[in-house]
């Protein structure tokens, strides 16, 4: 997979590495964020807690660093799954990414969104989130719709099992 500037990768549709972080709280709710409208693509859309592009071989370090930069969250992350997608996201942007999805759990509601990256955040019940996505799919990023669909089909029980120690 190529190592080039992310803007070039998106303009030319060149395949590259990315990561997406899912965060759940001790009530089992997922943190979602609405990206700042000024973002160069997918601005103003709802998505998972944070995303980024993998530059080094240390995926967990990069994801934890990005999570702190965007939301002020520090937590342990675990690999959940990986997928590839190739989608046009605007008239000039193409997402051709191998996306590693990571998951983390927090006991706190203390979130400190970076206003340059994030317009707002909210905690959502996963079932309600799926309903909102079905009703208004254009309000959500392409990759987040793929992720939530995959989680619903294959990983929901695993996530609930992971939440059990946090709820105790």
Where in this protein do the model-derived segments appear?
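A glycine-rich, hydrophobic loop/mini-helix early in the fold
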Residues: 18-53
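Short clusters of small/polar residues that mark proteolytic maturation junctions
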Residues: 2-6, 35, 84
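The catalytic Nudix box helix
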Residues: 31-32, 49-80
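Acidic, metal-coordinating catalytic segment for phosphate/diphosphate chemistry
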Residues: 1-20, 26
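Short, surface-exposed secondary-structure junctions/capping segments
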Residues: 14-24, 52-57, 131-145
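Nudix hydrolase/Nudix homology domain
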Residues: 7, 43-44, 81-84, 89, ...
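A structural signal for short, well-ordered beta-strand segments
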Residues: 21, 50, 79, 100-102
């Amino acid at each position: 997979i190529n190592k080039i500037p992310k803007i070039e990768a998106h303009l030319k549709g060149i395949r590259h590495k990315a990561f997406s972080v899912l965060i759940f709280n001790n009530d089992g709710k997922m943190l979602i964020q609405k990206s700042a409208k000024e973002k160069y693509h997918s601005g103003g859309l709802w998505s998972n807690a944070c995303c980024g592009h993998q530059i080094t071989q240390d995926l967990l370090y990069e994801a934890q660093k990005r999570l702190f930069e965007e939301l002020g969250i520090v937590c342990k992350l675990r690999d959940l799954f990986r997928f590839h997608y190739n989608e046009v996201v605007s008239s000039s942007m193409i997402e051709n990414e191998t996306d590693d999805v990571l998951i983390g759990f927090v006991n706190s509601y203390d979130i400190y969104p970076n206003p340059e990256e994030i317009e707002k955040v909210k905690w959502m019940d996963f079932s309600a989130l799926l309903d909102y996505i079905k009703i208004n799919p254009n309000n959500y990023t392409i990759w987040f719709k793929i992720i939530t669909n995959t989680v619903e089909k294959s990983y929901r029980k695993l996530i609930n099992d992971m939440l059990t120690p946090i709820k105790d």
